[in-house]
Curated annotation (Swiss-Prot):
NCBIfam families xref list: EF-G, PRK12740.1-3, PRK12740.1-5, small_GTP
Gene Ontology MF, one: translation elongation factor activity
UniProt keyword annotations, A-Z: Cytoplasm, Elongation factor, GTP-binding, Nucleotide-binding, Protein biosynthesis
Underlying gene: fusA
Cellular localization per UniProt: Cytoplasm
Organism for this UniProt entry: Staphylococcus saprophyticus subsp. saprophyticus (strain ATCC 15305 / DSM 20229 / NCIMB 8711 / NCTC 7292 / S-41)
UniProt: GTP binding residues: 17-24, 81-85, 135-138
Lineage: Bacteria, Bacillati, Bacillota, Bacilli, Bacillales
Family classification: Belongs to the TRAFAC class translation factor GTPase superfamily. Classic translation factor GTPase family. EF-G/EF-2 subfamily.
Signal peptide positions on this chain: none
Family annotation (InterPro entries): EFG_II, EFG_III, EFG_III/V, EFG_IV, EFG_V, EFG_V-like, EFTu-like_2, G_TR_CS
Domain tr-type G: 8-282
Domain of life of the organism encoding this protein: Bacteria
Primary location class: cytoplasm
Full protein name: Elongation factor G
Length: 696
């Protein structure tokens, strides 16, 4: 079966934004206008098409990125709706990895908000071209110029409007198109009746100034256009469009559009911009992977149906009707249902049962998927997030995704024996779906400990265990994931010698331990000269250190950011073994704990609090009392914004405290930023508490 849409007529886009900027509503409207749904679902009524998990409809926020296919102007648009809440940044990362372009939605009253900065940063990391949609122009306090200024100030982005609004709040009635210098007026509530009119006389001067600024900004990225611009030559509409498209796909320029998705204005024009300015799979750089058996040999996955099949699995979900669904993006080649593929990441052969194209939570069966497509497969048993799927003869591994370690943990206990088995199943499935969710059994207490990216993240996962898997469980108090590190250097010896009849055990190492830079992780250097420690025992020394570091040296937390240089040692011809050198390495680490000034580190959260000015004093005092460090303040509209770094351990239950301090008028967001040293008195408490737990 031939493909319905050629590659140049395919767009893979994400909708990304801060929580409550109107992202899901915007996606809804796209689906409405592209004929995918017949009645518009409102997020605040809990009836939105994209938010199909029960928890999402209850909370009115988007948690999982549902992939949806729509058609517009003879193009296929695959849309991934991404969550805007910081606890779900991993979902955003996953989506961005497989997109070719994105629409960043801003709230016209607030402009760029903290989570916008986070997702913008992630999109920049992955080199994703973006257009910006300033939404909610009908909202009280909507200010288009202010929103655009925040893009420049907070994101340092080369962005210029390609549209201007006429009016704001209740008066928002039309949109000026600065590329074609025309105006679109809306004559009905559903936004289906649009009248193209001339730019009103009293807005002409403003439009001409804005167009000149647009041409200048785009000309800076295009030498030919710059020559014309400087020579005062006429720049035609096709020339300007082509230059905007090139600058946008090269991630050098960001067109800014305007509208209100809720009141159905500006969405069709935004869809036109997606087609006009965002790249097709042919416009983006080919994805570079490497050979499975040789990580140094690069392999290119070219967007071509005739090439070898290569795809990246970016999401795993459990569907109540068809079981495990694996969402994947095809980078090259084609795939038919019923065929076999190779999971080159795990070196496993898998059979693709059925291929589905998803629309929020309804589905359409496909026989074949082509390069550039986003689809879901049923029947892949061993494939997880970030795995590469390829043809059986192909041997490519696409660059995978790195997921952050959890910063918060809870204990969960099943209420009954029946819940115990169900909980095990639930935890396995939830970990398959979400790589930032970890679960393990504590060896000492026997408790099941779950870890995630924040309180809301774990709340929702516990909620899903109850609703989807019928697991009743008791949840313990949140626990912080502390870490340990060394502050100074020392040379130490670890010697393990045991003789108890027959063959003995002998291993002897001398290691220099020193602090590594923050985020540098563990670095092991083999500086042995002359074979004083035979080569076959070196990996055992490194393994022994890694194992011991997992349990720390002070309070049982993993030891991080440490360098270890093995420079001397000795061995015995008969008695030395891998095990003996492993033990010797762990003894060296114990010795280092006495000399290297070990400290406990705690996760520091970047917290942004927004509230009316009159509560500023109370909030600042509260932040300080939580051992927070204020990093700056700025006015935002008629509110004040405080940026601070606060230890995670001090942020539990902060939502309640903020509510009472601001009479419900304050909001905050936080995400993990870095690890920092714990004050001595608190470190002593942590050590005491942990040694008490071990004694029990």
């Amino acid at each position: 079966m031939a493909r319905d849409f050629s590659l140049d007529r395919t767009r893979n886009i994400g909708i990304m934004a801060h929580i409550d900027a109107g992202k899901t509503t915007t996606t809804e409207r796209i689906l409405y206008y592209t004929g995918r749904i017949h009645k518009i679902g409102e997020t605040h009524e809990g009836a939105s098409q994209m938010d199909w998990m029960e928890q999402e409809q209850d909370r009115g926020i988007t948690i999982t990125s549902a992939a949806t296919t729509a058609e517009w102007d003879n193009h296929r648009v695959n849309i991934i709706d991404t969550p805007g809440h910081v606890d779900f940044t991993v979902e955003v990362e996953r989506s961005l990895r497989v997109l070719d372009g994105a629409v960043t939605v801003l709230d016209a009253q607030s402009g760029v908000e903290p989570q916008t900065e986070t997702v913008w940063r992630q999109a920049t990391t992955y080199g994703v071209p973006r257009i910006v949609f300033v939404n909610k122009m009908d909202k009280l306090g909507a200010n288009f110029e202010y929103s655009v200024s925040t893009i420049h100030d907070r994101l340092q982005a080369n962005a210029q409007p390609i549209q201007l609004p006429i009016g704001a709040e209740d008066e928002f009635e039309a949109i000026i198109d600065l590329v074609e210098m025309t105006c679109f007026k809306y004559t009905n509530d559903l936004g289906t009746e649009i009248e193209e009119i001339e730019i009103p006389e009293d807005h002409k001067e403003r439009a001409e100034e804005a167009r000149a600024a647009l041409v200048e900004a785009v000309a800076e990225t295009d030498d030919e256009l710059m020559e014309k611009y400087l020579g005062d030559e006429e720049i035609s509409i096709p020339e300007l469009k082509a230059a905007i498209r090139k600058a946008t796909t090269d991630v050098e320029f960001y067109p800014v559009l305007v509208g209100t998705a809720f009141k159905n204005k500006g969405v069709q024009l935004m869809l036109n911009a997606v087609i006009d300015y965002l790249p097709s799979p042919l416009d983006v750089k080919p994805i570079i992977g490497h050979r499975a058996d040789n990580p140094d040999e690069e392999v290119i996955a070219k967007a071509d149906d005739n090439a070898e099949f290569a795809a990246l699995a970016f999401k795993v979900m459990t569907d109540p009707y068809v079981g495990k669904l694996t969402f994947f993006r095809v980078y090259s080649g084609t795939l038919s249902s019923g065929s076999y593929v190779k999971n080159s990441t795990k070196n496993k052969r898998e059979r693709v049962g059925r291929l589905l194209q998803m629309h929020a939570n309804s589905r359409q069966e496909l026989n074949t998927v082509y390069s550039g497509d986003i689809a879901a497969a049923v029947g892949l048993k061993d494939t997880g997030t970030g795995d590469t799927l390829c043809g059986e003869k192909n041997d490519i591994i696409l660059e995978s995704m790195d997921f952050p370690e959890p910063v918060i943990h809870l204990s969960v206990e099943p209420k009954s024996k029946a819940d115990q088995d169900k909980m095990t199943t639930a935890l396995v499935k939830l970990q398959e779906e979400d790589p930032t969710f970890h679960a393990h059994t504590d060896d000492e207490t026997g408790q099941v400990i779950i870890g995630g990216m924040g309180e809301l993240h774990l709340d929702i996962l516990v909620d899903r265990m109850k609703k989807e898997f019928n697991v009743e469980c008791n949840v313990g108090a949140p626990m912080v994931s502390y870490r340990e590190t060394f502050k100074s250097s020392a040379e130490v010896q670890g010697k393990f010698a045991r003789q108890s009849g027959g063959r003995g055990q002998y291993g002897d190492v001398k290691i220099e331990f020193s602090p590594n830079e923050t985020g540098g992780g563990f670095e092991f250097e083999n500086a042995i000269v002359g074979g004083v420690v035979p080569r076959e025992y070196i990996p055992s020394v490194e393994a022994g250190l890694k194992d011991s570091m997992e349990n720390g040296v002070l309070a049982g937390y993993p030891l991080i950011d440490v360098k270890a240089r093995l420079f001397d040692g000795s061995y015995h011809d008969v008695d030395s073994s891998e095990m003996a050198f492993k033990v010797a390495a762990s003894l060296a680490l114990k010795e280092a704990a006495k000399k290297c000034d070990p400290v406990i580190l705690e996760p520091m959260m970047k917290v942004t609090i927004e509230m009316p000015e009159e509560y500023m004093g109370d909030i600042m005092g509260d932040v300080t009392s939580r051992r927070g460090r204020v990093d700056g303040m700025e006015p935002r509209g008629n509110a004040q914004v405080v940026n601070a770094y606060v230890p995670l351990s001090e942020m539990f239950g902060y939502a309640t405290s903020l509510r009472s301090n601001t009479q419900g008028r304050g909001t905050y967001t936080m995400y993990f930023d870095h690890y920092a040293e714990v004050p001595k008195s608190i470190a002593e408490d942590i050590i005491k508490k942990n040694s008490g737990n071990k004694a029990e």
